[in-house]
């Protein structure tokens, strides 16, 4: 069974692409260099007398009705290959242990190669936490309808479906799917038809307030701004490209996008009641705290957790523990007893 799967993965273009994406995200120099997340432009106002017991700081939050031990999401990144399957299982076990949310990488491959379903089959590893299914929104224009979306939700036993918007990646990717016409209407149909919430995210170029409002108006339950400042998928596709002109195209757009902090601030101002996820270049608990103070309900990290999980399950657990300790320290040193208090106390200042 395993050898047959390996042969399929080698011979399948979509699986070859998945393997290349995973390798580059683990080992490649694919981060934005010139554009930053924008979080460095903010600083917390220190509270010398917090009037708190550090041991009593409570990181628990609710998001979309889910009760979580901390406001943290292991963001969508991988799936569809044996290596990705093992990484997903490690991510799921640690997410379950920590009581946080986990998203998987795009499940489009399941619709073309159902035999790779085991690489996404992680509910056994994570029986009680929210799991997020994932599909490129553009696939709604390439044969994926409500039934296909329901199928990938069911296969993961997911609590929500993420639709990712990646126009730049598709534009610079060799053979990318570039027809984004009419997607908003189809997203609305999907939101009304599925029994689970639909979350829409970018992949590292950001969602503007205008686009976020359009999405919420058709029924999207939450927005993951997924801004610029972390992984540049234009760089990833440039590194993969075999054709020189395609490589140049990817490199030309390597620094394209809206910084994560700017997205978050603008979207929250326009849609103060919409649940928001902040992802895109967050690196530590201080960035997570800044995202929460700017209005996010959850903070998502992908590449840092992916790299730790590739090393070992223990390395991943330690990475998350450190991040949560950093977050607690920010709460303590701002006099905030809970993550919600970071926002309520208005203790983040632009510098």
From Swiss-Prot:
Keywords on record: Cytoplasm, Flavoprotein, FMN, Isomerase, Isoprene biosynthesis, Magnesium, Metal-binding, NADP
GO CC entries: cytoplasm
Transmembrane residue ranges: none
Keyword DNA-binding included in the entry's annotation: no
EC number of this enzyme: 5.3.3.2
GO BP terms: isoprenoid biosynthetic process
Subcellular location: Cytoplasm
Positions annotated to bind Mg(2+): 170
Gene Ontology MF term list: FMN binding; isopentenyl-diphosphate delta-isomerase activity; magnesium ion binding; NADPH binding; oxidoreductase activity
Recorded catalytic activity of this chain's protein: isopentenyl diphosphate = dimethylallyl diphosphate
Domain of life: Bacteria
Residues where FMN binds: 75-78, 106, 134, 201, 231, 281-283, 302-303
CDD domains (alphabetical): IDI-2_FMN
Primary location class: cytoplasm
Essential cofactor(s): FMN; NADPH; Mg(2+)
InterPro entries, alphabetized: Aldolase_TIM (IPR013785), FMN-dep_DH (IPR000262), IPdP_isomerase (IPR011179)
This protein's record includes keyword Magnesium: yes
Entry's family note: Belongs to the IPP isomerase type 2 family.
Subunit structure: Homooctamer. Dimer of tetramers.
Functional description taken from the UniProt entry: Involved in the biosynthesis of isoprenoids. Catalyzes the 1,3-allylic rearrangement of the homoallylic substrate isopentenyl (IPP) to its allylic isomer, dimethylallyl diphosphate (DMAPP).
Protein name, per record: Isopentenyl-diphosphate delta-isomerase
Gene responsible for this protein: fni
């Amino acid at each position: 069974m395993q050898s047959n799967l390996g042969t399929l993965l080698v011979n399948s273009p979509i699986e070859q692409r998945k393997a290349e994406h995973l390798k580059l995200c683990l080992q490649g120099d694919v981060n934005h260099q010139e554009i930053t997340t924008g979080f460095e432009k903010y600083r917390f106002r220190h509270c010398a007398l917090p009037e708190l017991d550090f041991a009593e700081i409570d990181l628990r939050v609710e998001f979309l009705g889910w009760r979580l031990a901390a406001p943290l999401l292991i963001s969508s990144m991988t799936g569809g290959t044996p290596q990705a399957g093992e990484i997903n299982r490690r991510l799921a076990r640690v997410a379950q242990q920590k009581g946080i949310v986990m998203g998987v990488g795009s499940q489009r491959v399941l619709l073309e190669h159902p035999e790779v379903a085991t690489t996404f089959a992680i509910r056994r590893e994570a029986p009680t936490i929210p799991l997020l299914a994932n599909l490129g929104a553009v696939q709604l224009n390439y044969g994926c309808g409500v039934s296909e979306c329901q199928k990938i939700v069911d296969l993961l036993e997911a609590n929500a479906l993420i639709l990712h918007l990646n126009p730049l990646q598709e534009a610079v990717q060799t053979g990318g799917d570039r027809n984004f016409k009419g997607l908003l209407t189809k997203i609305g149909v999907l939101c009304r038809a599925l029994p689970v919430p639909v979350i829409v995210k970018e992949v590292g170029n950001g969602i503007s307030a205008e686009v976020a409002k359009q999405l919420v108006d058709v029924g999207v339950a939450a927005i993951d701004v997924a801004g610029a400042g972390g992984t540049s998928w234009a760089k990833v596709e440039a590194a993969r490209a075999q054709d020189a002109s395609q490589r140049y195209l990817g490199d030309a757009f390597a620094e394209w996008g809206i910084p994560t902090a700017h997205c978050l601030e603008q979207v929250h101002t326009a849609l103060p009641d919409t649940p928001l996820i902040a992802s895109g270049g967050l690196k530590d608990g201080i960035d997570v705290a800044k995202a929460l103070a700017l209005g996010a309900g959850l903070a998502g990290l992908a590449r840092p957790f992916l790299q730790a999980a590739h090393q070992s399950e223990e390395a991943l657990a330690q990475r998350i523990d450190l991040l949560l300790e950093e977050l607690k320290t920010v709460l303590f040193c701002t006099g905030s007893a809970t993550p919600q208090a970071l926002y309520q106390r208005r203790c983040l200042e632009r510098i």
